[in-house]
Amino acid sequence: MIISESLKFLKKENKVLYWSGWFNAALFMLAFILFFVDDRQIMSINAWIKPMKFALSVLIYVWTFGWLLQYLPAKNKVSFISWGITLCMIVENIAIFFQAARGETSHYNISSALNASIFSTMGIFIGINSVFIFYTLILFFTEKINLDQASLFAWRAGLFLVLVGGAAGGMMVGNMAHTVGAPDGGPGLPFLNWSTVTGDLRIAHFFTLHGLQAIPLFSFLFASKTSKPMLYNIVFFVCYTGACVALHLFAMLGRPLFS
């Protein structure tokens, strides 16, 4: 019931990101079906697991952004950000699905001119997406936001963590791999495929990106019920960020988190 009401509200407030979310839900279902009818593997896992993961992640991302943008008073800026993010995510998913259909990896793949151009295009649009996130964070400091200070801090902190997660993603691009101490494609956790034999930078990347959901959710579900919500939000943010940094350093040492 809560989810249904939230989606109705999101549809009213931001149709662009509302339908963008449903588009990614459809992509997830498409990849889910293809998982059972196409047994080809890319780097030791089914070719359609990665498109599934990305479609689900983008779904969560765009609906979260649709929710937080309601607090910005300038609707023209909301529309600009919404369309920009939607376009960037469409390009990312097209690239990932196209490469999966070809039986090729999408990330760090420069084995041919086509593969290199696809990977470069993905990098460009992820960079543009990061600019939209940074712009939104600036607006959350400069615009008059109709939120209490504790909730406002939570959204600012979440946006900041997404940018940090993007920087961590940039490190993986610089490394041209997501594992440290062994080639990509080794044994990993089911579905997530996080390495169980060596360091994996994707773990910290995942949790940092989803700080956009974790910090505001903590604020809404727990901190807001206390007499000092700002203090609880700050403590949780520091602990959460510290854990993400620790996960990143652990991976940089080439140590698996799960084994």
Where are the regions that the model predicts?
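Interfacial segments of alpha-helical transmembrane regions
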Residues: K77-I85, K144-G165, P229-F237
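Early transmembrane hairpin module of multi-pass membrane proteins
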Residues: E5, N14-I126, A204-I215
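Juxtamembrane boundary at the C-terminal end of a transmembrane helix
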Residues: L249-S259
